Amino acid sequence: MKMPIIKKLVETASFEELENAELSILEEQQPDIEVEGDDEGEQLTHVMAAIWIKKEMEKEGIPFPKALRAYTQKVRVSIGG
């Protein structure tokens, strides 16, 4: 998971573009938007993170850095760290 890639997706892609990219990657297709990553798993992680962060920013009315922190804390908890 690379934060600069997630930030770029949050800033440049719409919800619809991100959701379509997620679907494309899951179906082993090339997404319509550029999604950087070493493999499809990392690309999917970046897209899913960007979707979660955009939703959090909208729901809570918070800036990207705060939403990113909330996301990384959520990930740490889910992996037991």
Over which residues does each language-model region extend?
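C-terminal alpha-helical interaction appendages
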Residues: 1-81
